[in-house]
Amino acid sequence: MTDSKTEAAFKPVELYTDGACSGNPGPGGWAFVLRCPRTLKEIQRSGGQPHTTNNQMELMAVIRGLEALKEPCAVDLYSDSKYVGQGMSSWMAGWKSRGWKRKDGSKLVPVKNVELWQELDQQMQAHRVTYHHVKGHAGHTENELCDKLAVAAYQQYL
């Protein structure tokens, strides 16, 4: 998650993300709020797909948020997705070392959503990303906003 650049080279940003699905699988949406605490500049983006899963939309929200960064950043990522958090902090290194396979008992099987995990891994290379879990639907302002935007994004597919 960290490259050889010094800590001072990383601009601090906050990335809030959420994914939502109507049915799982079903129509889904993703959203992010990206904020620079130094300037208070903020961007919000969202999108959707007609047939997807909640986990795919959670991953897409983080990927699209990281893609929006134009320079190396120290990213504080806030998400209610334990799937994203565990994948980034615990599972991804092992998956990569096994050729993007996961252990299932004594055998190796393909990682679910592997294309998205690989895209996330690629996006993370330029940044220092720190995951922070927030409880969903618990009044966290930015998480609630992302949820609202993600739900609105999939409405067009209903």
Swiss-Prot record:
The keyword DNA damage does not apply. Keywords: Cytoplasm, Endonuclease, Hydrolase, Magnesium, Metal-binding, Nuclease. PROSITE patterns: RNASE_H_1. One of its GO terms (biological process) is DNA replication, removal of RNA primer. Residues 9-155 form the RNase H type-1 domain. Binds 1 Mg(2+) ion per subunit. May bind a second metal ion at a regulatory site, or after substrate binding. InterPro entries: RNase_H, RNaseH-like_sf, RNaseH_domain, RNaseH_sf, RNaseHI. Mg(2+) 1 binds at residues 18, 58, 80. Its EC number is 3.1.26.4. It catalyses: Endonucleolytic cleavage to 5'-phosphomonoester. Signal peptide: none annotated. It is an enzyme of class 3 (hydrolase). Mg(2+) 2 binds at residues 18, 147. One of its GO terms (cellular component) is cytoplasm. GO terms for molecular function: magnesium ion binding; nucleic acid binding; RNA-DNA hybrid ribonuclease activity. It is found in: Cytoplasm. Its cofactor is Mg(2+). The keyword Magnesium applies. Endonuclease that specifically degrades the RNA of RNA-DNA hybrids. Monomer. Belongs to the RNase H family. This is Ribonuclease H. It comes from Rhodopirellula baltica (strain DSM 10527 / NCIMB 13988 / SH1).
